[in-house]
Amino acid sequence: MASPGSGFWSFGSEDGSADPENPGTARAWCQVAQKFTGGIGNKLCALLYGDSGKPAEGGGSVTSRAATGKVACTCDQKPCNCPKGDVNYAFLHATDLLPACDGERPTLAFLQDVMNILLQYVVKSFDRSTKVIDFHYPNELLQEYNWELADQPQNLEEILTHCQTTLKYAIKTGHPRYFNQLSTGLDMVGLAADWLTSTANTNMFTYEIAPVFVLLEYVTLKKMREIIGWPGGSGDGIFSPGGAISNMYAMLIARYKMFPEVKEKGMAAVPRLIAFTSEHSHFSLKKGAAALGIGTDSVILIKCDERGKMIPSDLERRILEVKQKGFVPFLVSATAGTTVYGAFDPLLAVADICKKYKIWMHVDAAWGGGLLMSRKHKWKLSGVERANSVTWNPHKMMGVPLQCSALLVREEGLMQSCNQMHASYLFQQDKHYDLSYDTGDKALQCGRHVDVFKLWLMWRAKGTTGFEAHIDKCLELAEYLYTIIKNREGYEMVFDGKPQHTNVCFWFVPPSLRTLEDNEERMSRLSKVAPVIKARMMEYGTTMVSYQPLGDKVNFFRMVISNPAATHQDIDFLIEEIERLGQDL
């Protein structure tokens, strides 16, 4: 790019100093020109800067600190003694950034502007006057923007515009009025840790390429096992891409424990294996059975009571039925915090049955595991210490940025022997350090993302007591919602009694249905209410809450709270918004 002031149409001094009120320099005139649309501003800037021969590329303009000629400071002196220069992104591409020669200055400016975009988004995420979502239908977004991938590179101005556009239409999951999923909130320390993790950009193969992260995973998993109740935090574990994969790990290890020959010889070498889980459990158990060749028909669903808890007597009955057929029960997966009702299976009773029949006991505490951090609520997981394995997702109730899921195993070394393949190019046996820290061979993946650092850094910042306060607050908000709507006109609870978790399940009954008899016609009409209200929520962008049918129950709202930014006022707003949007149905 030609230097400022070198073009035929350049104005003012070569040092680029300018008074915005008196545009007497190329930079100032270029700032004015950027107000023109249709690429005219870029073409004028090209003339002003002496780059008239370079074609101006399309795309929206980005008003940034760098576009005004101020680049990131590279010194520690105050006032700054760094040389000043202009960064016009319209003429810069990714190839101009590091490791390009002289790429430091545009790199610092570009990343600073990306950071500014992110920080603006963060601030907006907590602003209740902003929308949770700027909803557009898929065909609208596809027609409004060109998302296709091109052969030729775009300039950095367009890249910054893409960043802004992407965030404009993204869901603000940190918004205090976003209640749609189990994973909500935006923790600032966790966010900073995620940025650091991406900057380090390493893999969790071995100690030699991820020394600090491997140690932090060891320390953090040990602490989680201590909280579960395993003596001295003994055992094993790994961070996985999510609760579904953690549950599949448990199924894989349980099968290997009972029939180690399956690793080499496959399912043909073992009898038919049967797993058991509740009818309210997560669908990932069946997905895992399909992936491992066990088959979805080999996952038996156990009946639940009206609150969604597994019935132990039905579990034992089904185990005996399977054994009489000559099949082999190998896994019982109990749930601590079901996805819809937030129910906790009776873990002590399940543990007794598993011990009696020598079956691996897994606890899927992906959603409910966070309650172990609370002295007030951890009793709901009584018996989890008797499990052989536990899934625990800190990215749900504990508010750690996605993804952060752990599979904890009580028996040390079992995961390693189950999964190791001794790849000699990674796991050499003659290294000069303790090889037990080369954890990659016990994972199903080869490449593995660093998921531990955000949890570890948040734990250091909050302490266990901080997580406890977070969890206690969310459960108190759920009880507040339940207390308000249980006797409020127009609301019906899906099940009786206080929720055990932050899941509050209810129907909103509009005035037109309140006088109807409780019959099939009423249920049919009621089933259409929640979807319409949800659609209107998204159109207005004011709030979001999930709905679903379950069994013989027609569509109902499932409210979940895991965002510590939410308040009583946000709960009040949700109730008022549901009533406003559903009053005419």
UniProtKB/Swiss-Prot annotation:
One of its GO terms (biological process) is carboxylic acid metabolic process. Residues 1-24 are annotated as: Disordered. Its cofactor is pyridoxal 5'-phosphate. Substrate binds at Q181, L182, S183, R558. Pfam families: Pyridoxal_deC (PF00282). A lipid is attached at C30, C45 (S-palmitoyl cysteine). The modification Phosphoserine is found at S3, S6, S10, S13. It catalyses: L-glutamate + H(+) = 4-aminobutanoate + CO2. It is found in: Cytoplasm, Cytosol; Cytoplasmic vesicle; Presynaptic cell membrane; Golgi apparatus membrane. The modification N6-(pyridoxal phosphate)lysine is found at K396. CDD domains: DOPA_deC_like (cd06450). One of its GO terms (cellular component) is cytoplasm. One of its GO terms (molecular function) is glutamate decarboxylase activity. Its EC number is 4.1.1.15. Phosphorylated; which does not affect kinetic parameters or subcellular location. Palmitoylated; which is required for presynaptic clustering. Keywords: Cell membrane, Cell projection, Cytoplasm, Cytoplasmic vesicle, Decarboxylase, Golgi apparatus, Lipoprotein, Lyase, Membrane, Neurotransmitter biosynthesis, Palmitate, Phosphoprotein, Pyridoxal phosphate, Synapse. InterPro entries: PyrdxlP-dep_de-COase (IPR002129), PyrdxlP-dep_Trfase (IPR015424), PyrdxlP-dep_Trfase_major (IPR015421), Pyridoxal-P_BS (IPR021115). It is a lipid-anchor; Peripheral membrane protein. Homodimer. Catalyzes the production of GABA. Belongs to the group II decarboxylase family. This is Glutamate decarboxylase 2. It comes from Mus musculus (Mouse).
